[in-house]
Amino acid sequence: MIQKLFLLVRSLVILSIMLYLGNLIAYYIPSGVPGSIWGLLLLFLGLTTRVIHLNWIYLGASLLIRFMAVLFVPVSVGIIKYSDLLIEQINILLVPNIVSTCVTLLVIGFLGHYLYQMQSFTHKRKKVIKRRENQVKQAN
């Protein structure tokens, strides 16, 4: 029981430190990116470079994910409270969302097509090289 409590506290402390560092970065680098996103990027870098081990944060992260719906209640209440303001500004909110979604879909589509073509080209090139090697072996 004590060990599980220690693991929970350790994971929440690590997640809190990442959030704090993210907020610190957001304060000193005024790029418009929220501190929580910077914190997630730092956590991602820590996990991919294995500076932070997954089992160190697993318990706290699973606890937060389990209660994620409760964490969205204040946001939902805010949307309901300011729904008249959102309706007034719908064209300002809707047009950029639609345009950015379309641009994202186009970029991903073209990139996927390009990468598929490159993979096909690489596969064909390997076949040609293998065929040439076989021809050279047969000629000798």
Swiss-Prot record:
The chain crosses the membrane at residues 1-21, 33-52, 60-80, 92-112. This is UPF0299 membrane protein CGSHiGG_01475. Keywords: Cell inner membrane, Cell membrane, Membrane, Transmembrane, Transmembrane helix. It is found in: Cell inner membrane. It comes from Haemophilus influenzae (strain PittGG). Belongs to the UPF0299 family. It is a multi-pass membrane protein. InterPro entries: LrgA/CidA, Uncharacterised_UPF0299. Disulfide bonds: none annotated.
